[in-house]
Amino acid sequence: MAQPVQSIDVLLIEHAELELALADPELHSNPAEARKAGRRFARLAPIVATHRKLISARDDLQTARELAAGDESFADEIAELESRIAELTTQLTDMLAPHDPHGPDDIVLEVKSGEGGEESALFAADLARMYIRYAERHGWTVTVLDETTSDLGGYKDATLAISHKGASDGDAVDGVWSRMKFEGGVHRVQRVPVTESQGRVHTSAAGVLVYPEPEEIGEVHIDESDLRIDVYRSSGKGGQGVNTTDSAVRITHLPTGVVVTCQNERSQLQNKTRALQVLAARLQAMAEEQALANASADRASQIRTVDRSERIRTYNFPENRITDHRIGYKAHNLDQVLDGDLDALFDALSAADKQSRLQQV
């Protein structure tokens, strides 16, 4: 959910207050609050830095104009400073536009096969591999938390955790969620299935769900009494002895009926921890969607149309074409896209989202 636009003066005051708070040892007696304050301070830092550059450039421009009155050689410097001020003003306006508070977050991504049997499951596996390859290109970490395979090695369903922590290109603003949040929805494929003997093109689909992962489970209230936790023997690739111990964990959130399973970690405790993280992400997403619906049914409908609509994208193998129906994006490089070359598409989706946010300023 986007946050309302704030004035630079309000943010400058908040930044100064956070700087003082972070220097106070008392804050660090509560590690969770200290981390929360640190994350907010890091998010405000680029805004404050850009504002300071803008003020400095304006002061320099005023000085250059005064000097130019007696020396025409300063005319070129005036033009350069005016261009610099326009650039910084645009940057600051963008930073102050309504933003997604989950932008820096990691994600939990689920891929589910739909109608189409084995072909749909194979396509779901193609999508999972596409996202894994994209993450690898950016130095992100991917953990397969759970998977159910089909007879031909496709995915009936799979759950991935994708994290940018420690990545060379990671920063406080542009996280995994900011890049991949538009992937939720129905993905359609048109190709000749491996099971097709007549060479006919078939259409099938797979679904993708994407959730921002809370920095800490404690950010989402989960009552232990609302949970049913079952353990069973893992069938995944968790490590030695995985098929001889009850290491897999299934957690059911009784009030909502949400079920989360995790079996690919090496121990029952690790699987439980990861399952709780996934549950927290899903409950957070549900709560925010409900709050959005309560605030504005019309706006909620638009959000669902953009983010979770039927057939958000088509992958046409005979024509090597990918089409994103939400923004009219088309490209004839499907083979590269499926190998994780998604930045051009994600840039186009982000640009459309940015334009929408700027219209709210």
Swiss-Prot record:
Swiss-Prot/TrEMBL keywords: Cytoplasm, Methylation, Protein biosynthesis
Entry PTM: Methylated by PrmC. Methylation increases the termination efficiency of RF1.
A cellular-component GO term for this protein: cytoplasm
Keyword Cell inner membrane listed: no
Cysteine pairs bridged by disulfides in the record: none
InterPro entries, sorted: PCRF, Pep_chain_release_fac_I, Pep_chain_release_fac_I_sf, Prokaryotic/Mito_RF, RF-1
A Pfam family per the record: PCRF
One Gene Ontology term of the molecular function aspect: translation release factor activity, codon specific
Subcellular location: Cytoplasm
Keyword Protein biosynthesis: yes
Chain positions with N5-methylglutamine modification: Q240
Gene3D superfamilies: 3.30.160.20, 3.30.70.1660, 6.10.140.1950
Protein family according to the UniProt entry: Belongs to the prokaryotic/mitochondrial release factor family.
Function per UniProt: Peptide chain release factor 1 directs the termination of translation in response to the peptide chain termination codons UAG and UAA.
NCBIfam families hit by this protein: prfA (TIGR00019), PRK00591.1 (NF001859)
Protein name: Peptide chain release factor 1
Organism expressing this protein natively: Mycobacterium leprae (strain TN)
Gene that this polypeptide is encoded by: prfA
